[in-house]
Amino acid sequence: MRVNPYLSFPGTCREAFTFYATVLNGKLSDMLTHDGMPSGMDVPEGWGRKILHAQLVVGDTVIMGSDTPPPHYVTPAGFWVSISIDTPAAADKVFAALSDGGTIFMPIEETFWAVRFGMTIDRFATPWMVNCEKVG
């Protein structure tokens, strides 16, 4: 079994996933648009080039997402996408990038369980936890 996060966006999925691919050193494996749907399916006006389904491979994890047209889009709440990073320097770098233009919920710092841990909500409204565990 595998559990994968699926993120929703109000029309910014392409920008968000392109950004995440760069920050997380991932590979975009799918980026399907609404205008690629079979004929006869309803596509909201102006949403043809918006993302119907995206997949980003990061290590052995797949993050999926799409643009969700109004009134169905809901701002993310009640969860965090958690990233485990091997080195404090890499954790700081990823946290800084995800925080740029967003809101820092908990600054990245040493905690009793981690060399580095921080929580931020990025400029796309996705909540992230960045963690670099203590060894030993």
Task: Give a label for each model feature.
Residues 3, 29-32, 43, 50, ...:
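Vicinal oxygen chelate
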Residues 7-60:
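Core segments of cupin and vicinal oxygen chelate
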Residues 79:
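Short, acidic (Asp/Glu-rich) active-site segment that either coordinates a divalent metal cofactor
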